[in-house]
Amino acid sequence: MAHALLGPSSASRWMACPSSVRLCEQFEDVESEYAKEGSLAHEIAELKVKKLIDPGLTSRKFTSAMKKLKDKELYQEEMQGYTDEYVEFIQEQMYSYETTPHISVEQKVDFSQYVPGGFGTADCILISNDTLHVIDFKYGKGVPVSVENNAQLLLYALGAYLAYEMIFPIEHIKMSIVQPRLTGIDTWECSLDYLLTFAKKAQEKAVMALNGDGDFNNGEHCKFCKAKATCKARANANLELAKYEFKSVDLLTLEEIGEILQKAKDLDKWVKEIEKYALSESLKGNNIPGWKAVNGKGRRSFKNTDDAIKVLKENGIAEELLYERKYLTLAQIEKVIGKKDFNNLVGDLIVMN
């Protein structure tokens, strides 16, 4: 699927650091396994919402389509429970209106009127009377995403408003992020005036980005930047963190320890990103002065476990010595039976240590 140069998913970065846009053009797009897993979960969620709103999607067609998704390599049964939470939230929102709202799923929205070449795909859009509600499904479990002033969703809302402004008297904007593996559901609201003010700001940043203007800015937005490992501005910012000035006393205060730990955490993250990049370059045959890629010791394993066990048993090794029977961990059990059933059955038996 084609992505806009100034797309919604990277808006927090290009609005905070416009110069990063041209810099990132030097790097190829690489889709991680986590991203692929998220895409599959989105497909499942989309199918379920369509079953909810499309009378033409018969049970037979739905079952057939779901089977194809379940046959994919990255499919996990827990995806069913997590996507159910997203669908149930949409259903709740639909029923909260006095009249049946307009609803669209996986709709392409265009906001190029403000951001040149700007477009994206909104997971779900609900419109009733003067209210436009954008709902976004995030399957990741790494870092919670805040919905407040979220640039990605604001651009989705902007595109949806431009598409429907002649049909609905939109004055009120709602945005929700459903993160079932993390914080659950978060909603934030703003006025149309606020959205259009944001649009003007996005327009200014977009022009700067396309022209390669503005300074490079280090921050949380660097997390998903393709140039994060080799960006000199980020390197300078992180090296500044290392220049910690101590007061002329023999012992650190608790406040100083807290500050040092936070700086060390940020530095450690940056160094690991550089190490990962350096390793990938070494494996490509590029020379990193003073460093080289070496083979790790690795872990021993049988070429074929079944064959190995068979040989051991044939040579008098008792079968009970070769197996270990134990319960799965809490997380493994939840994954096997699904989050919803897990919580219903044993949720009240869980304690936090």
Residue ranges and their predicted role:
Residues 1-132, 172-174, 264:
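Metal-dependent nuclease catalytic cores that hydrolyze phosphodiester bonds in DNA/RNA
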Residues 18-24, 176-186, 226, 238-246, ...:
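Short acidic (Asp/Glu) and glycine-rich catalytic loops that position anionic groups and cofactors
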Residues 27-35, 142-150, 215, 250, ...:
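Short, charged/polar micro-motifs that form catalytic or ligand-binding hotspots
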Residues 36, 99-207:
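Mg2+/Mn2+-dependent nuclease catalytic core
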Residues 49, 53, 139-142, 157-165, ...:
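Hydrophobic/aromatic-lined pockets within catalytic cores
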Residues 83-86, 90, 260-278:
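Short amphipathic alpha-helical coiled-coil/interface segments
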Residues 174, 196, 200-266:
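Short, charged, low-complexity amphipathic alpha-helix
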Residues 269-353:
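Extended, charge-rich alpha-helical segments
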